[in-house]
Structures are given as structure tokens and as C-alpha cells.
């Protein structure tokens, strides 16, 4: 359920704002979305893994807080990350 180094680097390169950006809200949302996706697949196979389910809910909450922060700071950055990651219909 964790991301390996190559996956992290690919996400950083795709969503960074400048050359040395590794911690912007966009990068964090992209990494959380990837981890959420992997954990969701795990939970579909392992229905009774309640501790992983709790971790999934925490990650979803963290992503929601980051997206709210982005929406408050810059609506353009918010809509860009939403469309890139296909989070909302």
C-alpha cells in the first residue's frame, strides 16, 4: 500500500509547480490519491481488514483538508488538480 521511490518521483514530476517542488499541496494530494487507490483495492480483497479501513478514512480526510486549502488559496490550482486526478465527476 506504500508507494515505491519510482512511483513517488513520477507523481512529483507530474504535479510539481517548479523544479524543486516536492511538498506542495498538489503533490501531496496526488500522493494521497495514489495511496487511497491502492488501499481501496486491498480492502476490496480483504473485507475484514478494519485497521486498514481506518487508515483509508484518515487519508481521505487528509486529502479533503488539502483540497479545501487549495480551493481557499487558489481556485484555479484546485480545479486543475481535480481535473488531472479525475476526483470529482
UniProtKB/Swiss-Prot annotation:
Keywords, sorted A to Z: Ribonucleoprotein, Ribosomal protein, RNA-binding, rRNA-binding
Pfam families linked to this entry: Ribosomal_S15 (PF00312)
InterPro entries per record: Ribosomal_uS15, Ribosomal_uS15_bac-type, uS15_NS1_RNA-bd_sf
Membrane-spanning ranges: none
GO biological process: translation
Chain spans, region Disordered: 1-23
One Gene Ontology cellular component annotation held by this UniProt entry: cytosolic small ribosomal subunit
GO molecular function, one term: rRNA binding
Record-stated family: Belongs to the universal ribosomal protein uS15 family.
Cited function: One of the primary rRNA binding proteins, it binds directly to 16S rRNA where it helps nucleate assembly of the platform of the 30S subunit by binding and bridging several RNA helices of the 16S rRNA.
Assembly with partners or alone: Part of the 30S ribosomal subunit. Forms a bridge to the 50S subunit in the 70S ribosome, contacting the 23S rRNA.
Protein known as: Small ribosomal subunit protein uS15
Organism of origin: Prochlorococcus marinus (strain MIT 9211)
Name of the gene encoding the protein in the UniProt record: rpsO
Amino acid at each position: 500500500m506504500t508507494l515505491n521511490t519510482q512511483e513517488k518521483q513520477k507523481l512529483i514530476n507530474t504535479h510539481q509547480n517548479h523544479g524543486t517542488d516536492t511538498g506542495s499541496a498538489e503533490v501531496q494530494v496526488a500522493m494521497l490519491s495514489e495511496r487511497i487507490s491502492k488501499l481501496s483495492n486491498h480492502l476490496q480483497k480483504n473485507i475484514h481488514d478494519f485497521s486498514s479501513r481506518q487508515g483509508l478514512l484518515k487519508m481521505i480526510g487528509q486529502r479533503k483538508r488539502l483540497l479545501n486549502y487549495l480551493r481557499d488559496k487558489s481556485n484555479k490550482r484546485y480545479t486543475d488538480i481535480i481535473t488531472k486526478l479525475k476526483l470529482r465527476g
